[in-house]
Amino acid sequence: AEAASEKLSDRSEADKLKAACEVSKAVCASLVKEKKTAAPPKLFDLTSLQREANRLFGYTAKQTLDLAQALYEKRLLTYPRTDSAFLTDDMGDTAAGIIKLLCGKFSFMAGKDFTPELGKVLNSKKVSDHHAIIPTMELAKTDLATLPESERNILTLAGARLLMATAAVHTFEAVTATFECAGQSFTAKGKTVLYDGWKEIDRRYRAALKNKPETDDADSDTEKTLPPFTEGQTFENPTAKVTEHDTTPPKP
């Protein structure tokens, strides 16, 4: 496991600390474990579809709207000009049928036993004029390979989001370990996945894309899995290294 000290602005000071650590012992001073969950993402409204299509494929907002409109006119996607991220309460059976269809159509769902939690996406009170953007049952009559790649990207993106939105929560244990070495504190962060939930579908979907985008998880700094530690555990002559990082200004 890697543990980092606080930032040091002086390179020579960092080099001295590195040398001191390598002839010292590191002690696990504290170990904090916290069970956390990450809820599935919501279904797409137009704005969130445009944002995600830009992140994954580089499409502009207008390109995404035009592609979604073309799919709507082919009856493969529901009405795209919506500000709702939910389906109406009476759409449970429809959504279940579409999800079953998607599991058979999408190669990245092969071998995945999936039972949707439909209650997460049904809420008539949060639907005004039009419900969230999802594929339609017309997809059953369509070979995805015959669609233009850009349209296929949008349709698959909307379908993958329906699967993720109805999947189980992602449950993990966040671990923060603090070590003392050569008079300096070092911190290591990691996670232990308890139940993968919707993130397994997210990984499967991203792995199937031509260009593999990085996850945009807010908890990406805790993605590493740490080996088991106990408080008071010691490590003789730990390996140390100095790394340089550019500071980034705060976002406005």
Protein language model regions, located:
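Core catalytic DNA strand-manipulation module of type IA topoisomerases
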Residues: 1-252
